[in-house]
Amino acid sequence: MAAKKSKTKSKPKSTPRSGRSMHSSTILPVGITQMTCVEDPRDNVKKQLALIEQAAKAGAKVICTQEMFTSQYFCQCEDHRFFSLAESIPGPTTDACCRLARKHGVVIIAALFERRAAGLYHNTAAIIDADGSLMGVYRKMHIPDDPLYYEKFYFTPGDLGFRAWKTKFATLGVLICWDQWFPEGARLTAMEGAEVLFYPTAIGWHPSEKKEYGIAQHESWETAMRAHAIANGCYVCAPNRIGREFIAGPDGRPVSKDGIEFWGQSFVSAPNGQVLHRASTNKEEVLVVDCDMDKVEFARTHWPFLRDRRIDAYAGMTKRFGAGV
């Protein structure tokens, strides 16, 4: 599927924990990972499980993977071959994650390509509690269709809505990649009680556009999610993949001469929008960041955006366009 495989030459970097120490019971150490993906899903799963274990040993209590970590980003083209990469949930990968969660007593959010039924596929995240139980799944609601991001060919939009998960350590919300551009999803998930929002992601540059648009594209991406943190008074965590991926078409040649250069820079934002830690653009990393959960209620009472919502005036939000158009 890829022109050539990427290889990890050294152990992925484990970033020192950011934030206050664990002396306070309100501290939640959150782990996010970023890595390259290669053609063989078995190699990707093996690497991802190792990174999850590394995060757990570094003290993380909630750990989230990047979007569709089991494969390369095959959505650069529309090709029926790639449906074979999907798997059921529960399935072999989520079973392995459940065992790891139970072994280390951690919550795991595992994002992968789901085969729900014959002809029905989703871009999905499995939520696994610290006892190893599969709590359920979130299915990506907003599905893009842009050059080299042809997801509508593969994924049926999610039908489970936006919800929060009361795990052992905190109430968590999960959305996926393209969802991050829509404030409605973040707001509805926060209204369900989420204290931390996770956005497993696969986003990068078209290399030919990077010089002109690259900085602005990345800043827009990060700013959108930091705004969700501010507007909803919660932490936001966005694990992204790295590496340049070329996907081969049926003729064996790359469908794009440039591929996609995934920009990494996974990050954690505080409820005030401050970036607590940001990963590199090109290194496999494990970030473990201490999140003070008291700051969620502090933000929501000092910046009372949830209090001041005018729900009586928002009926138009459920319309495709305004009455004056």
Give the positions of each predicted feature:
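Short, glycine-anchored, charge-dense loop/turn motifs used at functional sites
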Residues: V30, I127-M135, F267-L276
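Cys-nucleophile CN-hydrolase/nitrilase-fold catalytic domain and related Cys-dependent amidase chemistry
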Residues: P41-R42, L49-R139, D146, I203-C234, ...
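N-terminal active-site segment of His-dependent metallophosphoesterases
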Residues: T15-K61, F198
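CN hydrolase (nitrilase-like) catalytic-core segments centered on the catalytic cysteine
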Residues: A86-I109, C177-E285
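Cysteine/selenocysteine-centered motifs that mediate thiol-based redox chemistry or coordinate metal-sulfur cofactors
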Residues: F162-E195, V296-V325
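Short beta-strand scaffold segments in enzyme catalytic cores
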Residues: A110-L112, T124-I127, R163, S266-V268, ...
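C-terminal beta-strand edge segments of enzyme domains
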Residues: A3-K5, S14-R17, S21, S25, ...
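Active-site-proximal beta-strand elements of phosphoester/diester hydrolases
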Residues: I27-E39, T124, V137-K140, A164, ...
